[in-house]
A protein has these predicted regions:
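Structural signature of outer-membrane beta-barrel domains
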Residues: 1, 31, 41-45, 87-89, ...
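Outer-membrane beta-barrel translocator domains and adjoining extracellular loop/strand segments
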Residues: 2-8, 47-53, 60-62, 104-112, ...
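Outer-membrane beta-barrel porins/channels
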Residues: 13-15, 19, 29-31, 59, ...
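Residue-level signature of outer-membrane beta-barrel architecture
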Residues: 24-28, 40, 84, 138-140, ...
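Outer-membrane beta-barrel signature, preferentially recognizing the C-terminal barrel domain
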Residues: 42-93, 98-101, 112-139, 175-180
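Gram-negative outer-membrane beta-barrel transporters
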Residues: 97-100, 118-196
Length: 196
C-alpha cells in the first residue's frame, strides 16, 4: 500500500462565456450545395484534472496528480463543405476543416524523488488541427437490398501543439488525437412497417 497526502482545500470556478456560431449555405442546384460553418466551443477541465489529490493510474502504471491552475481550453472551428444529394436518402460530402485551440489541456510529467514519474496536466500555449473529411451514404437497392443503406465517414487529421518557451515539452501532435478516423455502418429503414 501507499500513503497519499490528504487535501482539504476547495476551489470555486466561475465561467461566463459566449459561443457564437454561423452557418451559410450556397445552393448550386437542387442537389448540390456548399456550406460554410464557424463555431466557438469550450473544453473545461474535468474534476480529476483539477484535483491536487494524487491517484494511481493502472493504464499508465504511475501516479497522477491534477493541476488546480488549469484554464479552460477554447476552440474555434471553421468548416467548408461540398454536399451532393444524388437521390432520396443519399449523400456525398467532402469537407475541409480547421480548429484552433487556445490553452489546450495536455499531459506532462515530472520526476519525483525516486525514479518514477508523476503525471499531471498543463495548458499548452495553443494547438491546431486541420484536415479533410469524406461522408457517404448510399442506398443498396441497386444490389437487391431494398430498404438498406450503407454509410462511410473518413477523415485525415494533422495536429500540432505549441508549448510555451521554457517548458520541457516539444511541439508534437495533440495527446490522444488520431491521424485518421474511419466509421462505417449498415442501416435498415422500412417506413411501411415502421422498422429501422
Amino acid at each position: 500500500t501507499r500513503q497519499y497526502e490528504e487535501s482539504k482545500r476547495s476551489t470555486f470556478y466561475d465561467y461566463n462565456d459566449l459561443f457564437p456560431s454561423l452557418n451559410a449555405t450556397y445552393k448550386l442546384n437542387e442537389k448540390q450545395q456548399f456550406r460554410l460553418a464557424y463555431g466557438k466551443s469550450v473544453n473545461r477541465p474535468e474534476f480529476r484534472e483539477l484535483s491536487t489529490s494524487v491517484y494511481y493510474d493502472f493504464d499508465l502504471g504511475s501516479d497522477v496528480m491534477g493541476n488546480s491552475g488549469l484554464k479552460a481550453a477554447y476552440i474555434q472551428n471553421v468548416d467548408l463543405r461540398y454536399e451532393w444529394y444524388p437521390d432520396n436518402g443519399e449523400q456525398i460530402s467532402v469537407a475541409l476543416f480547421y480548429k484552433h485551440f487556445k490553452n489546450p489541456i495536455e499531459w506532462t510529467y515530472t520526476m519525483s524523488g525516486g525514479t518514477d514519474p508523476i503525471y499531471s496536466y498543463i495548458n499548452a500555449k495553443g494547438a491546431d488541427n486541420y484536415g479533410i473529411e469524406v461522408d457517404i451514404r448510399k442506398n443498396l437497392d441497386f444490389i437487391g437490398m431494398k430498404n438498406f443503406s450503407l454509410s462511410f465517414n473518413g477523415a485525415l487529421i494533422k495536429s500540432k501543439v505549441q508549448f510555451a518557451a521554457g517548458t520541457n515539452n516539444i511541439d508534437r501532435p495533440m495527446q490522444g488525437q488520431s491521424p485518421y478516423l474511419i466509421n462505417t455502418g449498415l442501416f435498415y429503414n422500412n417506413t411501411e412497417k415502421g422498422w429501422n
